[in-house]
């Protein structure tokens, strides 16, 4: 049983963060924000996949001018990612953005910080302080001998102090590093010092497999420790894939569930069907289904139903014959490998209608 650390509650749009709220799934568009249509299309795709908050880069005024069109009717709250230029933060808030990712210590003098904080207060816009181990201040790097967890936390607290000095507490913090161990240590240290909500992730995690593994290890340990209020799985891949990995991490730890869990055997010499292809096609066909249930795809008619008896519905294939089962009990036999997928999907549709009471 995971006992989550209680943090301050804040809202990004209508999505509750921290407090008693669940861990929220977040991602970031990789489109050019100046292209409002493609950016909005990706936001819609992310939302359909289960993303609850989306961040967009705002590198210049042209991107800021596209925000109203992107924001209008968005299915999820949006966070504007701002670097250095306080005017972009002001423009983003005027456009109706739901939150900012900006480091107040990097935007210039006190008057500029005052302007951003004043506007954020007026519009109830939270600010995420985002510390990255790869871009720490040179003085901190010299003090700690590198991008250590202590250096990352001190950097975050310096930014926090600028906001608290102005009585601004609508704040979330992230401490990201490409090192799993440094990231874990940094978040644990931060949690000892402040109770602001934490946005957790492993930055520059890598391509699909490497990034999914690093993120799963790092985030899994943080969640087990009770840390983390929002999450992003950073992948060098389609951002929609980040959302799927995030939900699987949450499901694996019993924290949240969304959509079917698909279990399948790793194949062996007894496998007599194209199981890898079948399992992938079942997963593809169920993408977008939000109902929570377990589907098994097994490669052996002898052991399959018994090994997957906990599955709500499953299929096991043999040479020219497949069996469909529910909770380990055979309900149908299917002849011909080419019929396995279509007949199984029909049974899943029937199962879902029954589950939904239709």
Swiss-Prot record:
Broadest EC class assigned to this enzyme: oxidoreductase
Residues that, per the record, bind [4Fe-4S] cluster: 265, 268, 300, 307
Name this polypeptide is given: 4-hydroxy-3-methylbut-2-en-1-yl diphosphate synthase (flavodoxin)
Upper classification of the organism: Bacteria, Pseudomonadati, Thermodesulfobacteriota, Desulfovibrionia, Desulfovibrionales
Cofactor details (free text): Binds 1 [4Fe-4S] cluster.
Gene3D superfamilies in the cross-refs: Dihydropteroate synthase-like, Sulfite Reductase Hemoprotein, domain 1
GO biological process annotation, one example: terpenoid biosynthetic process
Family under the similarity heading: Belongs to the IspG family.
Record HAMAP family: IspG
């Amino acid at each position: 049983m995971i006992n989550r650390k209680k943090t301050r509650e804040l809202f990004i749009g209508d999505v509750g963060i921290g407090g008693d709220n669940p861990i929220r799934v977040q991602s970031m568009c990789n489109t050019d924000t100046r292209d409002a249509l493609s950016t909005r299309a990706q936001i819609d795709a992310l939302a359909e996949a289960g993303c609850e908050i989306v961040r967009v880069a705002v590198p210049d005024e042209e991107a800021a001018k596209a925000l109203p069109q992107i924001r209008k009717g968005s299915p999820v709250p949006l966070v504007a990612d701002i670097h250095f230029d306080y005017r972009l933060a002001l423009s983003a808030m005027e456009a109706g953005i739901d939150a900012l990712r900006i480091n107040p210590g990097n935007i210039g003098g006190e008057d500029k910080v005052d302007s951003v904080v004043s506007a954020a207060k007026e519009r109830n816009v939270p600010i995420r302080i985002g510390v990255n181990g790869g871009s720490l201040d040179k003085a901190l790097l010299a003090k700690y001998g590198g991008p250590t967890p202590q250096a990352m936390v001190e950097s975050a607290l310096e930014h926090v102090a600028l906001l608290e000095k102005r009585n601004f507490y609508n704040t979330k913090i992230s401490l990201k590093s490409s090192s799993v161990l440094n990231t874990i240590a940094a978040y644990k240290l931060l949690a000892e010092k402040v109770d602001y909500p934490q946005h957790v992730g492993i930055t520059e995690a890598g391509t699909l497999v490497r990034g999914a593994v690093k993120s799963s290890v790092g985030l899994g340990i943080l969640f087990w420790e009770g840390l983390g209020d929002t999450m992003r799985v950073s992948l060098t891949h389609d951002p929609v894939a980040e959302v799927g990995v995030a939900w699987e991490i949450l499901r694996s730890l019993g924290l949240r569930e969304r959509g079917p869990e698909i279990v399948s055997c790793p194949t062996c010499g007894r496998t007599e069907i194209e199981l890898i292809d079948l399992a992938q096609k079942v997963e593809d066909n169920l993408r977008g289904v939000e109902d929570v249930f377990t589907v098994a795809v097994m490669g052996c008619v002898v052991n399959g139903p018994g090994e997957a008896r906990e599955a709500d519905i499953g299929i096991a294939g043999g040479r020219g014959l497949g069996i469909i089962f529910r909770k380990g009990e055979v309900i149908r036999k299917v002849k011909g490998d080419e019929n396995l997928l279509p007949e199984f999907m029909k049974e899943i549709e029937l199962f879902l209608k029954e589950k939904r009471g239709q």
